[in-house]
Curated annotation (Swiss-Prot):
Catalyzes the oxidative deamination of L-lysine in the presence of NAD. Can also use (S)-(2-aminoethyl)-L-cysteine as a substrate, but more slowly. Can use both NAD and NADP but the preferred substrate is NAD. It catalyses: L-lysine + NAD(+) = L-1-piperideine-6-carboxylate + NH4(+) + NADH + 2 H(+). GO terms for biological process: protein homooligomerization. Belongs to the saccharopine dehydrogenase family. Keywords: NAD, Oxidoreductase. SUPFAM superfamilies: Glyceraldehyde-3-phosphate dehydrogenase-like, C-terminal domain, NAD(P)-binding Rossmann-fold domains. This is Lysine 6-dehydrogenase. Gene3D superfamilies: Dihydrodipicolinate Reductase, domain 2, NAD(P)-binding Rossmann-like Domain. Optimum pH is 10.1. Its EC number is 1.4.1.18. GO terms for molecular function: lysine 6-dehydrogenase activity. The gene is lysDH.
């Protein structure tokens, strides 16, 4: 198969690294508006399969020209490009996967292209990161093994191995996105009813092998498409994992309106957004700076099988790759989108149209693919008679 990777940033680079190592991948084209950046990645990865091109993703004609001759597109661009990329892929007759974008309902707009994609014989899968992404695939896999699905509980965190004050956290993805997840309300299902709860609320203790006690709390966006894929759930909740005390400190910032987009103040005659100041202060403070990080993930799917109450639990503790200087979050995210792109290219995934991950990605095959890449996902089944 021939794969086009859009975006030579961290995720695009790591997806390309994974793709060129696959025997099934004949050629990889890495496209970016900054050609020098793409060419630098090509030099770093030392693969004859890999080539760089300049593409402005805001120009559908350039996008279409770049897509031609490829089997699958791995879209590792900022989420605002996702709808344009999906539409262009459908028009060009090329399969496409992306990292998602629930801010501004971008993923919803991609999902609305289902009939067009189906008619074109194209598969589009959005939301293929960790959360959403890995958690959706594992939720769908757990649900497929039950006769009735009653609850899905999700816990995910990307944290430093050795925390440092003031927040005991280092950012492993966009800080802007993090503030949005902490500020916007979280959608949950409780007692069969959809409702919103404040982010950073309902803090609970949580433990993982080698890590704990930690804390978990509600944040926005994590339940993604699961409430629609499983509308009859009695309970659906997503919580972010951090070191203890983090939620309380961040809640103060939110309560002071320092994280909101719509707040401005006047200082010495200048209009200033406190959020912009906060981001400028936090970015150098919270930079990972090459320190070790870890992704902790737990998915708990409950329901009934053969009349018995059954709980399926999936868990991973994944560390960074020191040799290649790749964060744990980048590994788990890039491996997920690359592995699923290859499942489409190999003909393992054959459904055509636009589907969220939980409805189309075979969980057992996905777990095997991640194991090959050093990301081990354990599975535990508990049956209550």
């Amino acid at each position: 198969m021939k794969v086009l990777v859009l975006g030579a940033g961290l995720m695009g680079k790591e997806a390309a690294r994974d793709l060129v190592q696959s025997q099934d991948v004949e050629a990889v084209t890495l496209a970016d508006v900054d050609l020098a950046k793409a060419e630098q990645t090509v030099r770093q990865l030392h693969s004859k399969k890999l080539a760089a091109v300049r593409v402005d993703a805001g120009d559908p004609q350039q996008l279409a020209a770049a897509m031609k001759g490829h089997d699958v597109v791995v879209n590792a661009l900022f989420y605002q490009f996702n709808e344009t990329v999906a539409k262009t892929a459908i028009e060009t007759g090329v399969h496409s996967v992306d990292l998602g974008g629930h801010i501004g309902h971008i993923t919803d707009r991609v999902l609305e292209l289902h009939e067009r994609a189906q008619a074109a014989g194209v598969t589009i899968i959005p939301d293929l990161g960790v959360a959403p992404g890995m958690i959706n695939i594992l939720s769908g896999y757990g649900a497929s093994q039950l006769d009735e699905v009653e609850s899905i509980l999700l816990y995910v965190g990307g944290i430093p191995v050795r925390p440092e004050p003031p927040l005991e956290y280092n950012h492993v993805f966009s800080l802007e996105g993090l503030l949005d997840h902490y500020t916007d309300p979280a959608l949950i299902i409780r007692n069969g009813q959809k409702q919103e709860v404040p982010s950073l609320s309902e803090v609970e203790p949580i433990y993982f092998d080698r890590f704990g006690p930690l804390e978990a709390f509600h944040t926005s966006g994590g339940t993604s498409t699961l409430s629609r894929s499983f509308p009859n759930l009695k309970r659906l909740e997503y919580k972010t994992i951090r070191y203890r005390g983090h939620a309380e400190k961040c809640k103060l910032l939110v309560d002071l309106t320092l994280t909101r987009h719509d707040v401005e103040v006047e200082i010495n005659g200048c209009r200033v957004k406190p959020r912009d100041v906060l981001l400028s202060v936090l970015k150098p403070l919270l930079d990972l700076k090459g320190k070790d990080d870890v992704v902790l993930l737990r998915v708990i799917v409950g329901g009934r099988k053969d009349g018995k109450e059954t709980v399926l639990e999936y868990e991973t503790v994944t560390f960074n790759d020191r040799e290649n200087k790749v964060t744990a979050m980048a590994r788990t995210t890039a491996y997920t989108i690359s592995a699923v792109a290859q499942l489409i290219g190999r003909g393992v995934i054959t459904k055509r149209g636009v589907y969220p991950p939980e409805q189309i990605v075979p969980g057992d095959v996905y777990m095997d693919e991640m194991k090959k890449r050093g990301v081990l996902i354990s599975e535990k089944r508990t049956v209550h008679s």
